Amino acid sequence: MEVNILAFIATALFILVPTSFLLIIYVKTVSQNN
């Protein structure tokens, strides 16, 4: 089974970018509430 590196990177970015974006918004919201 051959793994396509570009497909793997694209999938990783597609998952990590929105997750990190939501995480940053969450942290900012929590810090503002305090």
UniProtKB/Swiss-Prot annotation:
Keywords: Chloroplast, Membrane, Photosynthesis, Photosystem II, Plastid, Reaction center, Thylakoid, Transmembrane, Transmembrane helix. It holds the Pfam family PsbM. The keyword Nucleus does not apply. GO terms for cellular component: chloroplast thylakoid membrane; photosystem II. Disulfide bonds: none annotated. It is a single-pass membrane protein. Its main location: plastid. One of its GO terms (biological process) is photosynthesis, light reaction. The chain crosses the membrane at residues 5-25. It is found in: Plastid, Chloroplast thylakoid membrane. HAMAP family: PSII_PsbM. NCBIfam families: PS_II_psbM. PANTHER family: PHOTOSYSTEM II REACTION CENTER PROTEIN M. One of the components of the core complex of photosystem II (PSII). PSII is a light-driven water:plastoquinone oxidoreductase that uses light energy to abstract electrons from H(2)O, generating O(2) and a proton gradient subsequently used for ATP formation. It consists of a core antenna complex that captures photons, and an electron transfer chain that converts photonic excitation into a charge separation. This subunit is found at the monomer-monomer interface. Belongs to the PsbM family. This is Photosystem II reaction center protein M. It comes from Triticum aestivum (Wheat). The gene is psbM.
